[in-house]
Amino acid sequence: MDSQDPVPVPEIVWDLRKARSNLGKHKVSFEEAATALEDPLSTTKPDPDHSISESRFLTLGLSFRHRLVLVAHTDDSDEIRIISARLPTRSERYAYEDDNLQQI
């Protein structure tokens, strides 16, 4: 790869039925969740407790609606699949804010 070549960006995908269910249950659309994944200040950590067959991750990021959103997803080289999304708990919000204050 030439140093001038752009880095390929994985496509963000999801199941439409799961997206409708998630919106009803958590009031967060997967469209909004996808924008939280693009937050440059987002934090991502592995989520091994919720899957044995695939690597899952939890990303906490700010969405285009200026809401902090926790996104459960898989991440491979060519696509990111959103599994669920919700608003964070108080302690998750504090952790995000604390992590980003330390970067200033």
What do the PLM-derived regions correspond to, one by one?
Residues M1-I104:
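Ribonuclease/tRNase effector modules and their secretory precursors
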